[in-house]
Amino acid sequence: MKKIIQSFAFIAAAALVLTSCKKDENQVIFQGGTAPVLSASNAGPFVLLKDRKEDPATTLAWTNPNHMFNTGVSSQNVTYILQADTAGKNFSSPKLQEQSIQNDLEFSMKVKDLNSFFSKMELAAGVQHTIEMRIKASLSSGAGVLYSNVLSVTGTPYLDFAVEPPGTAANNYNDG
């Protein structure tokens, strides 16, 4: 009888311990957002010139994606990445270029910035090309990725070197 009472007391105590604690938490659930809308002050066609590399080329602007959670609009920092790729590649080519833009809803590009996108994609200088740009917006944790509309930009890049090679006028090198 003593064993039965002890067993019953143990079961009652265990039940009391397990049912006395209520899980009190506020689960934050991502509910989506609105894709940013990208626009440009000028989409070209640009004729990019090296001697005007510090001049403004265009300003890209986009809307806030308003990432939503079940607790309301996100107050977390949003990371914006400007992506550029050759036209028709659907941002999947190995020459895709990205530039991080922290917590801002616009980016002013100089001629040299725009030319850099063309050059890094290994597009021939002196020939008109079309590239596509979009904004990738994500929360600081990498969650909630939203992409903007695609903007086509046309331009003719110039040849630019970090160090001028031998035989160019800038290096004043005589190879003959």
Predicted regions and their residues:
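Alpha-helical transmembrane segments
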Residues: 11-15
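Acidic/polar, low-complexity intrinsically disordered N-terminal segments immediately downstream
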Residues: 4, 23-132, 136-174
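C-terminal motif of bacterial Sec signal peptides marking the signal peptidase cleavage site
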Residues: 17-20
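Bacterial N-terminal signal peptides that target proteins for export
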Residues: 1-9
